[in-house]
Amino acid sequence: MHEILTVTFGRKSNFCWTHFWNTQESYFVYDPNDHAKVNVNTNFRVLKKRDPEAIVTVPRECIYDTPIEFGNTRKNWLEELNESSGGKGTAWDGKLTQIMQTPVDVHPYQEALWSRDEIHEGNAIESEYELPSIRPKSVKYWSDFNRLFLDTEYLFPVNCSELNSSDFSFQLGVERFHDFDKQFNVWDEGLRPLVEECDSVQGFQAAIDIDTPWGGFASEYMKVVQDELGECRVPTWVYGIREPIQSDSSATIDNHFGKLNEALSLSQLNGSCSQYFPLCTISQGDDLWASSAKINLAIESFTLPTRVYGSSCYRMKDIESKLQSEGRGFIHNLNFKAKNYSSKEWALVSSASFVNVAQDYSQQNNCLFGVVRSPKDNQGLLEGKNYNASSISKIVNIQNLGLPSLETVPEGLRTLDTVFVEATNDGQINSHIQGLTKSLNRRFVSFVDQDELEEIREILSSYII
C-alpha cells in the first residue's frame, strides 16, 4: 500500500475535510463481486471490535480543533472499542471527557445516522435507510454532517477558543502548541503510531486554518514532524485555508490579523512542506458548509489520482515532479469547473484559492498538473481550442468515475458529476504574496524583532516567481 496520512487544524479545515471523507466513503465496495475503482486503504485504516468479525474503517487522520467544534461525533461504537482496548492511557481519557461534557444539540442528520447504526448493528452491508436532507444554514459544526466513525484516539481538542478567530495572533498559536506538546506529545501520541501502521507512506497532507492562530500552532507542529522524519523525506502538502482577503481600504483589524497570520505561517512553513495550496472558503451567499463543499470539488478531484487503480494512478511524488517541472515554485492555486455530464455548459467555474469569479481558467493554457473526471468518456472534454497537446499531456484523464452525489452537500451540487481541476502558478499567487508581505507591520508583530521581520520578508519574497 502507499498510504497518505492527514492532519487537520481548525474549524474551516475540518469542514473541508469532512466533505472530503464523506466522498471517500462513497467509494467503499461491500459486494465482493464488485470491482473497486479507488483504493480506500490509501486514506483509511481498519479497527476491530471485541467481536473479530465486526470492523470499522476510519480515516488515517489526526484532528485538531477546539472542544466545541467536535460537536457530536459518531463515537458510540468507538467508545465501546476504547473501553475494551484501554485506549492510549490516561491522557486520552481526560481529553475524551472534555468533549463529552460540552452540551451540544444533536443535528437531525446525526440523529438519523445514529438510528441507522442501531438498526444495522452487526450488519456488514447497510440496507436502504432514508436520511434527511441538510438544510442550508443549519450546520453549526463539521461533525453535524460527518458520515464516518472517527478513531477517538486521534481526536485532539485544544482548549483555547481563540484559536479559531482571525483577530488573534500567530504567536498565540505558537504558545498553545508548546503548552499542548508538553502535556500530550504530538508525535508520540499522534502521527507516530499511524506512521508505524503503514507499509509505505506515500505522503502527508495537512489542512490549516492559516489566517487564525492555528497557523502558528500548525507551523510548529510541522517542524516537529520534519524533525522526527529526519532524512526520510516524503511529499508533504499543506492546504492553507482562509477567508477572503479584503482590499486595504475596507480591511478590518481582524482581517489584517488574518493576513498577518497567513504571512507568518507561510514563512515558517518554509522547509516543512513540499507543496502549498492556498484555499478560500467563503463565496457569495454561502455559509461555511456550502462553501467548503465547493472547495471539496477541487481538492477531492485533484488528489484522486493518488488513490485510484490503473493507469490513472499518480503518487504524490509523481504529481510533485509535474508541478516542479517548470521551476514554478511550491505554491499553487487550484482552479476548477464542474457540471453534469449530460450538460454542454459548465455549471460552476471558479477558483478554490481566491475569491470566486466566473472565469474559465483552462483557456489560459498555464496548467502545471490537472485532473478531469466524469462518469463516462472524457475525450470530448479535452478537445477544442482551449487544450493543446502540451496542456493535455499534463492532465490525468479519469473516466467512468464521476463525482459521487451525496446528501451531505448543498442540493445545487448533487447533480455535478464531471470536474476539471488544475494547479497553476501565475500572477494571482505573486499578487497574493506581495499583499501578505505588506501586512508585516511592526505595530502588529511586536513579538518579532526587526532582523527577524526582514528575514520573514525575504522568505516571502523568494516565493514570488
From Swiss-Prot:
GO terms for molecular function: GTPase activity. Gene3D superfamilies: Tubulin/FtsZ, GTPase domain. The modification Phosphoserine is found at residue 446. Disulfide bonds: none annotated. It holds the Pfam family Misat_Tub_SegII. One of its GO terms (cellular component) is cytoplasm. Belongs to the misato family. One of its GO terms (biological process) is mitochondrial fusion. Its main location: mitochondrion. This is Protein dml1. Keywords: Mitochondrion, Phosphoprotein. It comes from Schizosaccharomyces pombe (strain 972 / ATCC 24843) (Fission yeast). It is found in: Mitochondrion. Involved in the partitioning of the mitochondrial organelle and mitochondrial DNA (mtDNA) inheritance.
